[in-house]
Regions:
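Conserved N-terminal segment of class I S-adenosyl-L-methionine
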Residues: 1-79, 84-88, 98-101, 155-159, ...
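Short N-terminal helix/helix-N-cap motif within the alpha/beta-hydrolase-1
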Residues: 36, 95-99, 119, 126
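A short hydrophobic/small-residue beta-strand
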Residues: 49, 114-115
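Short catalytic micro-motifs in class I SAM-dependent methyltransferases
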Residues: 89-93
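A short glycine-rich, Lys/Arg-flanked "PGG" loop and its adjoining helix->strand segment in the class I
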Residues: 98-113
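Conserved class I S-adenosyl-L-methionine
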Residues: 115-140
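Acceptor-substrate binding/catalytic loop of class I
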Residues: 145-161
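A SAM-dependent methyltransferase catalytic signature shared across enzymes that methylate proteins
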Residues: 159-177
């Protein structure tokens, strides 16, 4: 049976992992791990990688390094178990982002790293789809209420929302990147100046001086190529 290949998103994660400075043998949790191909690739590179998912597909590839876990529930690992947690295209499927992120924070060692990817609904192409239909780019119609599925996008979030949730859950965001950009997305650059003006005006309403300073960081990221054109966000956060 042919083994699944890394997706473009997983390749971006693997490339970024190599630059995080994690030592050989570092304990990494990949959750959700899907087929297990990313956890297997991390193990091949010398990391002590394990995978977890509600689906058991990865058991065939990872063997004892796989655990069946419902990420909507309390995470089963002890405090300070992992050096890093990778969560690729997972948080948008979960019921409670805060609970998940605080659970991740609990099982990370001090200074541990969370690498997270999720669909970028703040991209210009996604914003224009929402303007026209009321639905973001990843979901062009209502979710099927008669057939609930673990892969339903029940928790899509913008970059500012994700930043807030990370900072309220024991993390400090250190990097914001994109996994990949589709050429068609650049056609929407026409709308970027209007977005710049509208966003600047909206941010002027903040009166709190501390938040105004933080909003400068948020604004800079919102207007970056990664957020304006990226298909998926790749966020790196550190446990504080």
């Amino acid at each position: 049976m042919k083994q699944p290949e890394l997706t473009v998103i997983q390749r971006a994660v693997l490339e970024r992992a190599a630059a995080l400075g994690l030592p050989a043998g570092a304990r990494i949790l990949d959750a959700p791990c899907g087929s297990g191909v990313l956890a297997a690739a991390l193990a091949e590179r010398g990391f002590a990688a394990v995978g977890a998912d509600v689906d058991t597909e990865a058991a065939a590839m990872l063997g004892p390094a796989f655990s069946q876990v419902n990420l909507n529930e309390s995470l089963p690992w002890k405090e300070q178990t992992f050096d890093a947690v990778f969560s690729t295209e997972g948080i948008e499927h979960l019921e409670n982002h805060f609970s998940f992120l605080r659970g991740i924070c609990r099982i990370l060692k001090p200074g541990g790293i969370l690498l997270l990817t999720t669909p970028n609904i703040a991209a210009l192409r996604s914003r224009m789809r929402f303007f026209g239909s009321g639905f973001f780019g990843r979901d062009s119609r209502p979710l099927n209420e008669a057939a609930r599925h673990p892969l339903h996008h029940i928790g899509l979030a913008t970059f500012p929302e994700l930043r807030y949730k990370l900072h309220m859950s024991g993390f400090r965001l250190t990097e914001v990147r994109h996994t990949h950009i589709k050429p068609i997305s650049y056609l929407y650059a026409f709308y970027a100046p209007w977005m710049w003006v509208y966003t600047k005006l909206a941010f002027r309403k903040e009166k709190d001086p501390i938040q105004r300073k933080r909003n400068k960081e948020i604004l800079s990221t919102l207007l970056s190529p990664s957020v304006l054109f990226g298909e998926c966000l790749l966020l790196v956060a550190k446990k504080v």
